[in-house]
């Protein structure tokens, strides 16, 4: 201090270290010097005393200088008081103060503590700066953490009582809620929402507070925001959650309106990120079951999710193909998902899945042989010794299945090439099937057994539901007057889940 002048840096440090009376005296009888020095030149600290007091969580000083006129006053960096209290403490400025008193080793410890307690460490900094500790391990971290959070709530309520604008945005377009969810602080978030904070405000990078809560990995805060968030079909929030692998909140996002087909600026959908980032089969299955576009192409290179998967996981590959992923789709470089990977590094199981699928496609859709993608895939397969051997085995198995007649119209290959469950149900109990050595079809054995099992399971459901219905209704009831063929025909249009519900419900009624 020179005469009646105090530099802004010194005043800032006093907010952390000095008592109320000393700071008050300086504020009343001195002029603040705002010339640049080692810290202010880097815009590390605020110039306005109220802003400094809020950063230091100095409640007594805040109470003595806050007014309705300065509660919404922006600082030199266009930051408002309500933003400061919602932000994490100014650890960079604190580090300068610690280094100035040769406390570098203590600062390193403080950084570790900061990571433990989600950046709520102003009280710990005060203890260190005022030398009120003998050993850093002696500090009651839980008590300090609680006090820091309590102070934040008290200061925030004080700002609101003087008219702080809950939805004021700073130069980055961030609202107080953006910062509260980024930290994160559940109590503070609840308080802001209760005071009317708008969770739908987008900052200059087009991110809402919900984006930051997802990044900070606090499901409780995220659920608070989801409940009040207004979703739209173009918001790629689901992709954001998948990129950060926030599996617990995905169901909530979808149920509350997050679009499963929304594209980000690169044209990627949630499925693109699910197969390339988290690679969690449950997440991928969830998206596919909800109707995500399995063949959506990105804006960059026209990549489908199958391209983005790089054919690395047999389970992912099988699931994508099961839901209609196009193995013959071409990207901007005229590469298919198969030709875009280095074939020598393609795992044996993935190679078998791809080749067996392509061989089936040729029989299901004969016209596909004229498509460029199919031609390129066949060329790649035949030019690779390992894949071509698989192709020859596939062709042999399909030819042998085609030679086994189940009826005058259908051959055994129907259990590989057909996905019509109604048709399979009509064929599955044919005695010829029981005589077939399914183990002789090494490549297609899994598909055959799966289709036989699911068709017999459905047939069992239909037959049992019919039995229960026929024994539930009175003889003169309309249902019992229908021909058996018509009853079966009606059952064909009811899905498995509904059949199961009907069966269990009527069985329960019969029991009682």
From Swiss-Prot:
PROSITE patterns under this entry? ANK_REP_REGION, ANK_REPEAT
Q: Which UniProt keywords apply?
A: ANK repeat, Repeat
The UniProt record lists the keyword ATP-binding: no
Pfam families per the record? Answer: Ank (PF00023), Ank_2 (PF12796), PRANC (PF09372)
SUPFAM superfamilies per the record?
A: Ankyrin repeat
Enumerate the ANK repeat regions by residue range. Answer: 45-73, 77-106, 136-168, 172-201, 205-236, 238-262, 266-296, 301-329
PANTHER family per the record?
ANKYRIN REPEAT AND PROTEIN KINASE DOMAIN-CONTAINING PROTEIN (PTHR24198), ANKYRIN REPEAT-CONTAINING PROTEIN-RELATED (PTHR24198:SF165)
Q: What is this protein called?
A: Putative ankyrin repeat protein FPV233
